[in-house]
Amino acid sequence: MIEADRLIQPTALREDEVIDRAIRPKMLADYTGQDHVCEQMDIFIQAARKRSDALDHLLIFGPPGLGKTTLANIVANEMGVSIKTTSGPVLEKAGDLAALLTNLEENDVLFIDEIHRLSPVVEEILYPAMEDYQLDIMIGEGPAARSIKLELPPFTLIGATTRAGSLTSPLRDRFGIVQRLEFYNIKDLTQIVKRSAHFLELNLDEEGAMEIAKRSRGTPRISNRLLRRVRDYAEIKANGEISSDVASAALDMLDVDKEGFDYMDRKLLTTIIDKFMGGPVGLDNLAAAIGEERDTIEDVIEPFLIQQGFLQRTPRGRIVSQRAYLHFGYDYEPN
C-alpha cells in the first residue's frame, strides 16, 4: 500500500535499521524524553539489581517509532544481562518459543516485539514460563503423549506492542510493569536531532534541528529519517550547512508541511471534509475512499492526527476538527 512509501511513516524502513542501531542510546542516562518512564524504570532496575533478582516482566506500548525496542535494550544493558530479540509473528509454534526460553541465562531478557500477534498456542506456553519459570511441553503423540515440566532460570520478558488493547487479559495481567510511551515534545525531539547529527558529523545549528523536530510528528524515528534527507539536500544545495531555512526548504521539497503532514495525512483529512462533510464517516468507508487499509489508518495515520487535535474518533465515526479546516484554508461550518 501507499503507507510503505511514506517518508514520515513511523514504522521502521530497512535504511533506518543500521543507522538507528548506531545512534541508539545504550543507557537510561542517554535516553531523551519519556521522563516519567525513565524515572520509574531507573528505580525498578536499581531495586532488582540490589536484590540480584530478575526485573519484573515489562510491557511497553505506544505508537510505532517512539523507542520501545531502544528501551528494551537499555533495560538489558542497565541490568548487565543479555537480551534475545524476536517478534510475535515469528513465533509460529510452541517449539519456537521453547527454544528461546531454554537458552536463556539467569536474569536474561527476552524481548518480543508485536507481542499482540502471538498465536494462542504459543501464548499458552508463555503463561507458566512467566509466572513460575516453568516450561510445559508435550512429548510424543496420540495416547502416548505426555507432558513434562522443565525448570527455567529467572528471566525478564519484555513485550512491545502498538495495540495494548489486543492483548488477552491473562497475558496482560502477567506483566508486573506496564509503561506507555507518549509522543515526544519539540524540545526533546530537538535534542534527539542534535544528538543524531553529532553521531553523523553534520553541521547543524539549533534552529535547523528545531525545524526538523517540528515536522517529525512527535516521533524520534521520523526525526532521524528526516535528518538524513535534509543532510542530502544540504550537501548539494548548501555546502553541508543545515540552518532553519535549509531544513525548511528541504522538507518543503519532500512534501512534509509545517505540521509534519504528508500526502496521506492531507488526503485523509481533506477526503473527510470534501466527501463526507467533515464526518462522521465509518472506518470502512474512509479506507475505501482513500485506498488504504483499515489497520494502517488506525495504527499509523490516525494516532498523531488525533493527538494533535485534527481528528476525532467517535462512536458514529471519524470527525474532522475545526483545526483541520483552518489548516487547509476551509471555512468551518460545524455539522
From Swiss-Prot:
Residues 185-255 are annotated as: Small ATPAse domain (RuvB-S). Has 3 domains, the large (RuvB-L) and small ATPase (RuvB-S) domains and the C-terminal head (RuvB-H) domain. The head domain binds DNA, while the ATPase domains jointly bind ATP, ADP or are empty depending on the state of the subunit in the translocation cycle. During a single DNA translocation step the structure of each domain remains the same, but their relative positions change. ATP binds at residues 23-24, 65, 68-70, 131-133, 174, 184, 221. It comes from Pseudoalteromonas atlantica (strain T6c / ATCC BAA-1087). This is Holliday junction branch migration complex subunit RuvB. Homohexamer. Forms an RuvA(8)-RuvB(12)-Holliday junction (HJ) complex. HJ DNA is sandwiched between 2 RuvA tetramers; dsDNA enters through RuvA and exits via RuvB. An RuvB hexamer assembles on each DNA strand where it exits the tetramer. Each RuvB hexamer is contacted by two RuvA subunits (via domain III) on 2 adjacent RuvB subunits; this complex drives branch migration. In the full resolvosome a probable DNA-RuvA(4)-RuvB(12)-RuvC(2) complex forms which resolves the HJ. It is found in: Cytoplasm. HAMAP family: DNA_HJ_migration_RuvB. It is an enzyme of class 3 (hydrolase). One of its GO terms (molecular function) is four-way junction DNA binding. The RuvA-RuvB-RuvC complex processes Holliday junction (HJ) DNA during genetic recombination and DNA repair, while the RuvA-RuvB complex plays an important role in the rescue of blocked DNA replication forks via replication fork reversal (RFR). RuvA specifically binds to HJ cruciform DNA, conferring on it an open structure. The RuvB hexamer acts as an ATP-dependent pump, pulling dsDNA into and through the RuvAB complex. RuvB forms 2 homohexamers on either side of HJ DNA bound by 1 or 2 RuvA tetramers; 4 subunits per hexamer contact DNA at a time.
